[in-house]
């Protein structure tokens, strides 16, 4: 989620949170009225309950927009909502509907132009046939009269056709411009409504709906909707208008013949309807697979370092392949359905022509119809039938749009449907109660017999009949084992969930009756894993302040600085180049964990809440920062109700009330003193096993260590300052001056050969260059890929059949011209029956022509089936394989690629769908349509030249007009495609970011501002596309009117050729149909220009990604070499060395993180790395794991440079446990097995998984779960507590029995009992292996063989814990601040 980095502009002119543009408000009001039976037109607030999920109020009063996270049941309890194609237009405003109505009129007018042209074709045909009859009769007077009629008719009618062409240009241009504009606005309205709807979902909904799913729906699904209601819908209206007008013309000229041909259109529509209905099911399956795969992809990109650490890129890539495999089957099934449908369509059309010519001949023979009129009727039916065929070809677009709408709008409509239950009464009660608590309430909280189980696991209660009173204005600490329900209490207090039974009361008022926004506005929250947004530090802190838009910029700045000082963040912020205006990046990745935590604390403190919830608020801080921040929190806790969740009992020493939770409820409760002196008390036992051995040190100012490591660039590294403490009188700055980094030359020199470190091999972040042959090259690669099957054969068969279908059209032209000339002997102007023997000859020839048409109809039916089926299957295989290849290639790229702000996990997951969807337009059925059109043009031109080269060349010479217009439009569409993606990439990322941080968004009532900014960004994106829309519409109009202009030219010049004897009526009509309508097919090629533009763009981008991945792999293979470990078991001993390493993060090239760092860690030893937040500790681990490559220097394992060769060769001997545990959706056992060296987690023996679980002390947790290791984890493992997730992550690391174990605060999230057990397990498993632990809590490194103290990217102290403590230097100061002695 992105907000304005500098919010001062808004402060000068405060805006209401709910302000929107009129179109959006009207559209959302309209769809709300259409979906709700309530007659109350006033804005409605929502309240969550235990049984329903409130719907979003998408527009509001003058004060605010009310949107909440629901607390009710999941979607299973919501009513099913049917979504049709026309449901999409509920999200159009009245103004947009009126504009669409105008555009519809223009499309109807454009569609009527071609059938009206047939009136004049029939008139000219009568004159031409009359001239032919006169020539055959030899009557000079008749010849002169017919000659004069030819000239007179072609001059007047050609001019009329010219006027029709000009009118069609303006009509086509206007309808395309109108629908391009309104489709963009409606799509924006749907995106806005969808995000608003997600904000009203119960929190358990997001356990299954990840950011990848949101990206797929907003990016891909809404794009499908926009295509359906944009360019495709007005063209469908135009084709339908063509059909209706053509039918009217046909009936006007011969109702008998038209009546016989009348069933053709219903049969076409019936075939199309059945095909569309059957295809929709296939598309729904495909979209569902893509959404699930997108969620998995987003998960993988978010945890890319975990995947690389355990070399599981291939495993996740194969799983992604499996998740998307069903798209191939769905595509094949859709291909068979479409093949049968299109074959039936062509059979109906050509068999209809056979019937028309056969029955028309009977009417002519009886004198009931003139040959010229039959030409008008047949041409009109020809135009109408092919209009229906073109309309038929768009059914897929409308089917996909409807399927996408069912997915997106269905989600919105479910919430609207479930918001009708007594909302007025609930609103009234809620508002009254909130007013009673608005002034002077005590903030006492009571949990009364609360029973709760998460909706995803209803059989496993977390809280069982819990009764607890939390007194007002005191500090209550909740401690206990991981999974005992501590964090669940916080979720219930914020109304993320509702108790299954019992109640939670605030001053004796059930919180379910309170305005949820008001309630959350009274609470300040600091989470264990802080969430920051891609905005400035100041803007992030401001988010915690209610009514911030009503305050001046000066007041806001003052409050932000005060809050930052309280949170011990002011010094490091002011040291940054841009200070408080520094952008923190997506999810705050530009800051260290401790820096993010302090900003989160400042965000909570700035609102001066009545209730303060602290969930391990200092877990990510170093010892000095923790001491100061803890003192600040103790001060902030005064005169407010504060609840602390903590595993570190030293942080709850000053709590007034301590509650010890167990699996079955409260074990004991009391003050710290009371509980600590209980002889057999649980708390006393926990306290005895904590390593806090001395009293805490009082700190009155900030012991900050600030440097440039893993954080933003500093203007300078400030001298560290600390006030006098009880035991420390010297300053840290003095210590920093007295402690010098060790001489690198004195470090241990590892055995083995030394290798020069290569330059950094990170992937360049420059925009990919366009490949001029992108689509062709990509197809060549995929055709050779064995995973795509017999792709070449499918394309050959599909293209050959498409070419045959295209060649049928000129054959039809020959048959048509022959049949028309055969009518010439019976061309009577007085309506007399045709005399013999001309009648017998005409009927005989007609039977041959009609039979030929029927044979063509049967052949087309079979050939078109194979044409469509083959290309559908080929397109599905190509898009599936491309999606998998791009995903696997992205996983191969360096970690630095994913640090780039433009390569967020949401954008990358969304791009997989966008690229595959784009490529489908050039490799699926569209490719067959283009081959078909080209065959029609080539064969048609050849036939025309054979029948009359003079007329053919003149008409063919006009073809460049069509081609030029199409090419220009192609270029504009390519530019539009690029601009559209660029414009909406930011909005998609914002939506995904807000959903990924849904708890934070909800806790701080950020939904109104999120929606306001999102809606503004959507408007800006739409506005930037308008010029491109205009250019494209003008060129589209030109391409559409060319047909009429060329037809006018053909009649004018053809008439003269006929009059001068250079051609016959048969030759004229053969040339007319072959060339003029061949030119139309040439124009139709460019109707697919948008599809090919998207395909070409997608191919170029895909090739760029594949090329980058190939280069990374090739470089690794080129530098790879056999490694011979100098040990008995042929395994590395585990010696780690960094030699003169200098490193800067690729995204911060001006900031030195490690400055010529040298250190050596002996094999089999336990080495701890400590230091202030951002001193470079975690960076050392990431270099050892080869996530990054040093700028200079070497990183060695047993003397071998790990920066050379395949990183997996070295990583298989290492295990990595990050500070913030990352789990995947899947079973607990699968997550643990992911760390094994086996290629497939499914192949890991159960005993091995169980052994790793025992080492990580997971036995009790697994025993409490009905399914044990088979328990399914949701996305990111959100139903597990932080400690439980961390233990699973430790088990994942231990299962591979590593030679080098890397721990980044591995036990920071554990409760005391779990920490003690896991620490003991880590101590045991560290025997015989090299263990490197980054730690803030010095009690966890008491058994370390060696401690390295880092500052500003250098080693400042080194030795055993006891040696460093006795040295009374920086380490000793850190230990005393934590109350630890060695």
From Swiss-Prot:
User: Which ranges carry the ABC transmembrane type-1 domain?
Assistant: 101-400, 797-1094
| Keywords annotated in UniProt | ATP-binding, Cell membrane, Glycoprotein, Membrane, Nucleotide-binding, Repeat, Transmembrane, Transmembrane helix, Transport
Concerning SUPFAM superfamilies, the annotation shows: ABC transporter transmembrane region (SSF90123), P-loop containing nucleoside triphosphate hydrolases (SSF52540)
One GO MF term: ATP hydrolysis activity
> Where in the numbering of this chain does the ABC transporter domain appear?
445-688, 1136-1377
Per UniProt, what is the membrane topology? Multi-pass membrane protein
Q: Provide the binding site for ATP.
A: 480-487, 1171-1178
- Where does the record say carbohydrate is attached? 62, 397, 680, 827, 903, 1020, 1324
Q: Where are the transmembrane segments?
A: 101-121, 159-179, 233-253, 259-279, 339-359, 374-394, 800-820, 848-868, 911-931, 951-973, 1034-1054, 1067-1087
Q: Where does the record locate the signal sequence feature?
A: none
Per the record, which residues fall in region Disordered? 1-56, 738-768
PROSITE patterns (UniProt xref): ABC_TM1F (PS50929), ABC_TRANSPORTER_1 (PS00211), ABC_TRANSPORTER_2 (PS50893)
| A GO term from the CC aspect | membrane
Q: Where in the cell is it found?
A: Cell membrane
Residue stretches of biased makeup (Basic and acidic residues): 1-12
- InterPro entries per UniProt: AAA+_ATPase, ABC1_TM_dom, ABC1_TM_sf, ABC_transporter-like_ATP-bd, ABC_transporter-like_CS, P-loop_NTPase, Type_1_exporter
- Family listed: Belongs to the ABC transporter superfamily. ABCB family. Multidrug resistance exporter (TC 3.A.1.201) subfamily.
- Name of this protein: ABC-type transporter atr1
């Amino acid at each position: 989620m992105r907000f304005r980095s500098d919010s001062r502009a808004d402060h000068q002119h405060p805006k209401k949170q709910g302000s929107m543009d009129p179109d959006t408000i009207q559209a959302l009001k309209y769809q709300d009225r259409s979906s709700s039976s309530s007659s109350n037109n006033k804005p409605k607030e929502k309240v969550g309950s235990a049984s329903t999920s409130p719907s979003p109020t998408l527009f509001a009063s003058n004060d605010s927009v009310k949107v909440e996270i629901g607390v009710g049941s999941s979607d299973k309890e919501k009513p099913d909502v049917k979504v049709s194609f026309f449901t999409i237009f509920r999200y159009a405003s009245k103004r947009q509907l009126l504009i669409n109505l105008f555009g519809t009129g223009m499309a109807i007018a454009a569609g009527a132009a071609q059938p009206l042209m047939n009136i004049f074709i029939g008139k000219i045909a009568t004159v031409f046939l009359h001239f032919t009859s006169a020539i055959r009769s030899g009557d000079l007077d008749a010849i002169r009269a017919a000659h004069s009629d030819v000239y007179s008719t072609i001059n007047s009618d050609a001019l009329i056709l010219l006027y029709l062409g000009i009118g069609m240009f303006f009509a086509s241009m206007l309808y395309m411009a109108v629908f391009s504009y309104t489709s963009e606005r409606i799509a924006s309205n749907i995106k806005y409504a969808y995000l608003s709807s997600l904000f009203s979902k119960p929190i358990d909904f997001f356990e299954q709906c990840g950011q990848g799913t949101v990206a797929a729906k907003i990016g891909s699904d809404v794009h499908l909707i926009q295509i359906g209601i944009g360019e495709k819908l007005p063209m469908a209206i135009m084709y339908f208008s063509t059909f209706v007008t053509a039918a009217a013309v046909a009936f006007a000229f011969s109702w008998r013949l038209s009546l016989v041909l009348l069933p053709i259109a219903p049969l076409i529509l019936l075939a199309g309807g059945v095909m569309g209905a059957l295809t929709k099911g296939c598309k729904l399956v495909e979209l569902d697979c893509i959404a699930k795969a997108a969620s998995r992809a987003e998960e993988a990109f978010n945890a890319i370092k975990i995947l690389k650490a355990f070399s599981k890129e291939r495993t996740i890539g194969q799983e992604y392949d499996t998740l998307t495999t069903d798209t191939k089957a769905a595509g094949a099934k859709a291909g068979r359905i479409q093949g049968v449908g299109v074959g039936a369509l062509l059979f109906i059309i050509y068999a209809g022509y056979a019937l028309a010519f056969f029955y028309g001949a009977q009417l002519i023979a009886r004198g009931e119809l003139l040959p010229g009129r039959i030409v008008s009727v047949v041409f009109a039916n020809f135009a109408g039938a092919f209009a229906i065929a073109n309309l038929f070809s768009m059914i897929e677009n409308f089917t996909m749009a409807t399927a996408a709408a069912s997915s997106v709008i269905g989600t919105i409509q479910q919430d609207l449907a479930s918001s009708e239950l007594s909302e007025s009464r609930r609103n009234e009660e809620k508002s009254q109660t909130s007013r009673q608590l608005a002034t002077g309430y005590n903030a006492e909280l009571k949990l009364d017999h609360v029973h709760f189980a998460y909706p995803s696991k209803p059989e496993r209660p977390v809280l069982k009949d819990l009764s607890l009173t939390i007194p007002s204005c005191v500090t209550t600490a909740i401690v206990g084992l991981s999974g005992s329900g501590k964090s669940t209490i916080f979720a219930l207090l914020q109304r993320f969930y509702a108790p299954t039974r019992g109640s939670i009361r605030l001053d004796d008022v059930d919180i379910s009756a309170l305005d949820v926004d008001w309630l959350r506005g009274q609470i300040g929250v600091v989470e264990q894993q802080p969430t920051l947004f891609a905005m400035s530090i100041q803007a992030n802190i401001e988010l915690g302040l209610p009514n911030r838009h009503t305050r001046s910029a000066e007041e806001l700045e003052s409050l932000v600085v005060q809050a930052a000082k309280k949170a011990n963040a002011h010094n490091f912020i002011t040291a940054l180049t841009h200070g408080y205006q520094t952008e923190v990046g997506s999810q705050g990745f530009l800051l260290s964990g401790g820096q993010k935590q302090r900003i989160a604390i400042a965000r909570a403190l700035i609102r001066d809440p009545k209730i303060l919830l602290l969930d391990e608020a200092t877990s990510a801080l170093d010892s000095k920062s923790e001491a100061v921040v803890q003192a600040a929190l103790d001060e902030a806790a005064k005169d407010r109700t504060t609840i602390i969740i903590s595993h570190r009992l030293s942080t709850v020493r000053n709590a007034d009330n301590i509650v010890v939770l167990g699996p079955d409820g409260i074990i004991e409760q009391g003050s710290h003193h009371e509980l600590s002196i209980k002889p057999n008390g649980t708390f006393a036992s926990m306290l005895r096993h904590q390593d806090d051995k001395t009293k805490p040190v009082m700190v009155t100012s900030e012991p900050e260590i600030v440097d440039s490591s893993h954080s933003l660039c500093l203007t300078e590294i400030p001298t560290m300052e600390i006030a006098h403490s009880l035991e420390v009188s010297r300053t840290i700055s003095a210590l920093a001056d007295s402690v010098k980094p060790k001489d690198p030359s004195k470090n241990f020199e590892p055995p083995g050969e030394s290798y020069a470190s290569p330059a950094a091999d990170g992937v360049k972040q420059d925009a990919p260059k366009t490949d001029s042959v992108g689509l062709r090259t990509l197809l060549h690669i995929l055709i050779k890929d064995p995973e795509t099957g017999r792709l070449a054969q499918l394309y050959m068969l599909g293209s050959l059949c498409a070419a045959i279908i295209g060649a049928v059209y000129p054959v039809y032209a020959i048959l048509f011209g022959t049949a028309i000339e055969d009518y010439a002997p019976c061309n009577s102007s007085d309506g007399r029956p045709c005399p013999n023997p001309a009648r017998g000859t005409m009927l005989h020839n007609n039977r041959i022509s009609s039979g030929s048409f029927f044979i063509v109809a049967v052949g087309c039916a079979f050939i078109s089936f194979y044409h469509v089926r083959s290309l559908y299957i080929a397109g599905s295989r190509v898009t599936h394989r491309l999606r998998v290849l791009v995903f696997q290639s992205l996983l191969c790229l360096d970690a630095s690629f994913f640090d780039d702000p433009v390569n967020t996990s949401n954008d990358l997951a969304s791009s997989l769908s966008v690229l595959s969807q784009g490529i489908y337009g050039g490799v699926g059925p569209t490719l067959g349509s283009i081959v078909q059109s080209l065959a029609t043009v080539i064969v048609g031109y050849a036939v025309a030249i054979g029948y009359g080269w003079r007329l053919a060349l003149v008409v063919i010479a006009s073809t460049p007009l069509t081609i030029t217009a199409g090419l220009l439009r192609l270029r504009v569409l390519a530019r539009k495609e690029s601009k559209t993606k660029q414009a909406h990439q930011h909005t998609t990322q914002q939506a995904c970011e807000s959903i990924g941080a849904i708890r934070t968004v909800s806790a701080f009532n950020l939904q109104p501002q999120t929606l306001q900014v999102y809606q503004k960004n959507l408007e800006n994106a739409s506005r930037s596309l308008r010029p491109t829309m205009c250019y494209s519409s003008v060129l589209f109009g030109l391409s559409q009117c060319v047909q009429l202009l060329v037809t006018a030219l053909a009649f004018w010049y053809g008439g003269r050729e006929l009059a001068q004897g250079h051609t016959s009526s048969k030759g004229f009509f053969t040339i007319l149909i072959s060339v003029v309508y061949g030119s139309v097919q040439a124009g139709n090629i460019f109707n697919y220009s948008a599809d090919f533009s998207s395909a070409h763009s997608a191919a170029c981008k895909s090739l760029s990604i594949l090329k980058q991945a190939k280069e990374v792999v090739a470089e690794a293979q080129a530098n790879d070499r056999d490694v011979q470990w100098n040990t008995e078991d042929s395994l590395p001993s585990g010696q780690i060395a960094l030699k003169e390493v200098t490193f800067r993060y690729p995204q911060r090239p001006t900031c030195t993180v490690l400055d010529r760092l040298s250190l050596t860690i002996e094999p089999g030893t336990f080495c701890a790395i400590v230091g202030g937040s951002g001193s470079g500790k975690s960076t050392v681990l990431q270099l050892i794991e080869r996530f990054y490559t040093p700028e200079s220097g070497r990183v060695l394992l047993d003397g071998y440079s790990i920066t050379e060769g395949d990183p997996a060769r070295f990583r298989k001997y290492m295990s990595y446990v990050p500070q913030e545990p990352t789990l995947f959706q899947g079973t607990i056992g699968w997550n643990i097995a992911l760390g094994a060296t086996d290629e497939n987690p499914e192949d890991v023996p159960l005993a091995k998984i169980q052994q790793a679980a025992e080492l990580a002390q997971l036995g009790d947790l697994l025993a409490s779960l009905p399914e044990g290791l088979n328990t399914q984890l949701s996305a990111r493992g959100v139903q597990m507590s932080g400690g439980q997730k961390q233990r699973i992550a430790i088990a994942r690391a231990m299962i591979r029995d590593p030679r080098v174990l890397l721990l980044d605060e591995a036990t920071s999230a554990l409760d005391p009992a779990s920490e003690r057990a896991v620490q003991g397990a880590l101590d045991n498993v560290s025997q015989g292996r090299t263990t490197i632990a980054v730690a803030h809590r010095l009690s966890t490194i008491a058994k370390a063989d060696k401690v390295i103290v880092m500052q500003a990217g250098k080693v400042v102290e080194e030795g055993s814990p006891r040696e460093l403590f006795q040295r009374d230097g920086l380490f000793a100061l850190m230990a005393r601040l934590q109350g630890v002695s060695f």
